[in-house]
Amino acid sequence: MDIRIQILEPDCYYHIYNRGINGGEIFKNTDNYLFFLKQFSKYVIPVCDIYAYCLMPNHFHFVIKIKSKEDLLFFAINELKLTKENNEGLHAIQNVVSKQISKFISSYSQSYNKVYNRHGALLESPFKRKKIDSEEYLRNLILYIHQNPTDLKRDFKTY
């Protein structure tokens, strides 16, 4: 199945991740990291809860739980102005989470390109997503994500 048509289901956990084109850098300084998180909060937090994340110079990982169907519907109606007439295709309620994540990635990429006078894609497309289907997998994934930076530094406290 094409990952682009894979629906992110309400009340389910997912591993969301991506990397720079050809493994290239997506964060050059602290301001980039902070802006990335600000955009994540703006676009993704309204539709998901976050359980873990890791931002690395060339990639990122998030463990998220999609909010309930009722919460997503409330967001879609009140924030995205979803109506019966425009509730189809990419604008359908079942696509609201993917759409918000795509807006987040696009907003960060456009800003990064403007700041660094570059053009074209910054991140591989589409963003990667994997449904977390067990508590054991969730626990191991959170450990993996939190330990990801230790490969860069011997002492994680200085990362």
Question: Where is each model-derived feature located?
Answer:
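Short catalytic/metal-binding and nucleic-acid-binding patches
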Residues: M1-Y159
